[in-house]
Amino acid sequence: MELSVSLYRYNPEQDKFPYMKNYKVKKPEKDIMVLDLLNMLKEDDATISYRRSCREGVCGSDGMNINGKNGLACITPLSEVLKGNKLELRPLPGLPVIRDLIVDMTQFYEQYEKIKPFLQSDSEPPEQERLQSPQDRDKLDGLYECILCACCSTSCPSFWWNPDKFVGPAALLQAYLSLIHI
C-alpha cells in the first residue's frame, strides 16, 4: 500500500511561488513518526529542507503543520495523523518561510523576549543559589514544559495578524510564570 505525501516546497533562489509537491512512498509495516517519513523522503529527494535535532520532543526544532495541525514531527506517530493514506506537510503558519518546511523564527523569539523571560527580583542576589521549595516546584507542573517550538503561537490567528501587538501563547505562558513569583 502506498502513502500520498503532499509537501510544501519553496526555494526562494529558484521558485517564484511556493507549491505543493506530491510524493508516493510505500506505507511502512510498523508505525513510525512523521520525522522518520520525512527522512525517508529525503533519501530519495535530497533537496527537501526541514529542521530536526533531538528526535525526542525536547528541542522543538521540527515544528510544522501536519495535516492541518501544528505539531512536532519527531513525536507525532504517522498513524495518528494520516487521513486515509494521505499526509500533508506545511511550514508553521504565520511566520516567513525560509525554504520548504523551515520558517524564520525571529518574530517569535522577539515577541518572547519582550516579556523578559528571566528571573527578575527586587532583592539583592544571594551569595549562593536561590532556593525553591518542593511545594513551589510542584506549582510549576504543566507550566514549565514549553520548549519554544512555536506550535501554539503559530496556531493563533491573533499572533499572525497582530505580530506587533500580541506576543502569543508561548510568551504569555512565560509571563504568567513571572507573575506567580515562584
Where do the model's predicted regions map?
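Short, contiguous acidic and Ser/Thr-rich linear segments
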Residues: 22-32
